[in-house]
């Protein structure tokens, strides 16, 4: 007889903290993987550029950024300003484990009452997280 040990990611500690310059390389990795996934879901792959080459790179780093860290590795991040949620990305293997929600919960107190964000209509997973935090869809 043998035993199988199953270790879930959520048993590992998820730390949400402010971005540091030393996170840059890992943040780029998260962005590049998750952005491609987002664009595949949104059927807009032609818009992809790695963060190093993205026209919005300067804008992203001018925002407030928090990272999600597991075992000293950045697995997600959120970037926002007072009235706009600009970017929220989590590595695929960590999605569906509440990390995006924790990042969003960190940002919400800083957002003005009427903040906005943009999401592809086909990105159902993101829309569920946003609506669970009180965001409503406007057309």
PLM segments and residue spans:
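Conserved GNAT acetyl-CoA-binding A-motif
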Residues: 110-122
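A short, internal acetyl-CoA/4′-phosphopantetheine-binding micro-motif in the GNAT/acyltransferase core
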Residues: 84-95, 119-120
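Conserved beta-hairpin
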Residues: 63-76
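A conserved beta-strand-loop-helix scaffold within acyl/acetyltransferase catalytic domains
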Residues: 78-83
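Conserved active-site alpha-helix within GNAT-family acetyltransferase domains
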Residues: 101, 122-139
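Conserved acetyl-CoA pyrophosphate-binding loop and the N-cap/start of the following alpha-helix
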Residues: 94, 98-106
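Conserved GNAT-fold acetyl-CoA-binding loop/helix
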Residues: 24, 28-57
